[in-house]
């Protein structure tokens, strides 16, 4: 309980910085006006078709990115990595095989099966590919997405 009391005494800015460092953002920019809030609320959701399914970009701003991915059973994304982007994937529905490695060789990559309720962190530089074992909905929470930061090593669907 003492720890909670100490946290409650911290300044708002100190809490923002501490929380930001915990999630890798270095700080969180608060919404300072109703205009800021309306700007985020009014941004349209971007629909991006993919060979393996589709992405719905819920948010992609300077501080973070949030997407909903649908991957059709048996389909896969490319084996790729990002030099800037740090990602966490959460399986909302379905199941995937997640291949991951810091090496460029998919054949020697580790594999983990993720099912509903599972999550996995993919740090900057980690090569990764998902393959859907059944139709899957996957949330991606990450730092900002830049298309030029996707380095594809092996083609997906």
Model-predicted segments: where are they?
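Glycine- and acidic-residue-biased ligand/ion/polar-headgroup-sensing regions
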Residues: 83-104
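Short acidic-glycine-tyrosine-enriched beta hairpin
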Residues: 102-125
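Double-stranded beta-helix
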Residues: 103-106, 127, 131-157
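A short, N-terminal "cap"/entry segment at the start of jelly-roll beta-barrel domains
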Residues: 1-65, 112, 155-157
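Conserved short histidine dyad/triad with adjacent acidic residue
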Residues: 67-85
């Amino acid at each position: 309980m003492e720890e909670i009391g100490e946290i409650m005494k911290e300044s708002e800015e100190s809490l923002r910085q501490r929380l930001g460092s915990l999630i890798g953002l270095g700080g969180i920019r608060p919404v300072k006006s109703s205009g800021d809030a309306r700007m985020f609320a009014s941004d349209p959701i971007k629909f991006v078709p993919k060979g393996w399914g589709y992405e719905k970009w819920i948010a992609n701003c300077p501080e973070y990115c949030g997407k909903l991915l649908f991957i059709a059973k048996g389909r896969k994304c490319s084996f790729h990595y990002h030099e800037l982007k740090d990602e966490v994937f959460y399986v909302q529905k379905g199941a995937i095989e997640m291949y991951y490695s810091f090496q460029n060789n998919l054949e020697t990559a580790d594999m983990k099966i993720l099912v509903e309720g599972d999550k996995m962190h993919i740090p900057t530089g980690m090569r990764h590919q998902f393959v859907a074992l059944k139709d899957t909905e996957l949330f991606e929470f990450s730092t900002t997405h830049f298309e030029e930061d996707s380095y594809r090593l092996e083609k997906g669907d």
